[in-house]
Amino acid sequence: MDVFKQSEVWFVIGSQNLYGPKTLQQVMDNAHHVVNSLNSEAGLPVKLVLKPLVTTPDEITALCREANYDTACIGVMTWLHTFSPAKMWIGGLSILHKPLLQFHTQFNAQIPWETMDMDFMNLNQTAHGGREFGFIGARMRQQHSVITGHWQDKEAHQRISQWMRVAAAKQENQQLKVARFGDNMREVAVTEGDKVAAQIQFGYSVNAYGIGDLVTVVDAVSKGEIDALVEEYEATYRLTDAVQLHGNKRENLLDAARIELGMKRFLEQGGFKAFTTNFENLYGLKQLPGLAVQRLMQQGYGFGGEGDWKTAALLRILKVMGTGLKGGTSFMEDYTYNFQPGNDLVVGSHMLEVCPSIAKEEKPLLDVQHLGIGGKADPARLIFSTPAGPALNASLIDMGNRFRLLVNVVDTVEQPHPLPKLPVARAIWQAQPSLATAAEAWIIAGGAHHTVFSQAIGVDELRLYAEMHGIEFLLIDNDTTLPAFKNEIRWNEVYYHLNR
């Protein structure tokens, strides 16, 4: 999955005509140098495209209008090389719908102490030109990001890359379609929510389909297609005796392959990039989709169990953000605790549906075992553990008057003991700042039992994602204390009530 190849970020230089053609030409020459260097040396995930210099309100407005309607453009990055009076930007910024990044940089890294004259000062005015631009953004109450640093600085490169990934995720939101196979798990609260409000806030659409619609496609899968996919299984995974040729669960594996092929075909035909299932709505399917869901997540699809469309959409978005990065991202659920002084642990898992992108093993184990929930035949699943390292759990919840993105930073650990009787994939982590504080803060904030677990994406990207969409962001990490966390929630209640 590479969602970045067809995308671009427009690099825009603002100035004014009073500087004269010689200075403006030097500005553009410097801009060409900066853009070419960033594209070739900074490791950015999205290509920068230098646009013509803008020096008048009409030019700025025309450029912003063009950016809105260019599907390849996922955002606009500005550099105020000289001074660009910000009233010129009001018309353009008032109609700009794409993410905006102000790169507060200058061409020279250091001051040329012995040679600096007024011509140099006239040309290099980022220090105050950027402040003028920043004022109009603040005055218009417009969300825009600011990155300060020299254009050759590695930290600046990293932050620009993060912004690009989040901008691409926002673009994905605008075209994302989520399919719900069946409805919500009966009587469950947190997986419900306002789908119309979500489409207004984020852009993605959520629609339900009867399980019979899926079954029709599943039943149409040919034997040849199934055999070919099972050969892929045999080459990719370690198969238990039960699912190998002539094994007593081989037929269950063939059924799982049929479900995967049918489910993927349904999603492709409808243009869906995220989906949900529900073990209470399985009529016509021989088993709960487990292996199918795991493999589709690894291919970049978002997923949520029990009809959880918010988690499905969020998972797809984090998959997009994390394209090409080390580490995986998966649907997850806090399942059980290990209460032990100095070694409190959380076991995260689900009935079946954990993405192999977070697998420690090069070849996960493929098996079929009994599942007491759902009342169907024993389902196929991949079984694996997760490597140690930094990670996070993210939950998107509907608070009625706003959406809340809740994030807990965790430290994934090596599985301390074998789990010979647990036939599901799992991750084990220590929650920051402690299990007690993290769990209490999560519960107080109304965090869902379903999360998106990621070892690829960090807090900065998710905070920026929340800012771009105007939603609440709450963080639980090593700096969290419960009194301060509760106060933040109280203050946010007032802010979002007044900001409706």
From Swiss-Prot:
GO terms for molecular function: L-arabinose isomerase activity; manganese ion binding. Binds 1 Mn(2+) ion per subunit. CDD domains: L-arabinose_isomerase (cd03557). Its EC number is 5.3.1.4. The keyword Transcription regulation does not apply. Its cofactor is Mn(2+). Mn(2+) binds at residues 306, 333, 350, 450. Pathway: Carbohydrate degradation; L-arabinose degradation via L-ribulose; D-xylulose 5-phosphate from L-arabinose (bacterial route): step 1/3. GO terms for cellular component: cytosol. Keywords: Arabinose catabolism, Carbohydrate metabolism, Isomerase, Manganese, Metal-binding. It catalyses: beta-L-arabinopyranose = L-ribulose. InterPro entries: Ara_Isoase_C, AraA_central, AraA_N, AraA_N_sf, Fuc/Ara_isomerase_C, Fucose_isomerase_N/cen_sf, Lara_isomerase. GO terms for biological process: L-arabinose catabolic process to xylulose 5-phosphate. The keyword Nuclease does not apply. HAMAP family: Arabinose_Isome. Catalyzes the conversion of L-arabinose to L-ribulose. Homohexamer. Belongs to the arabinose isomerase family. This is L-arabinose isomerase.
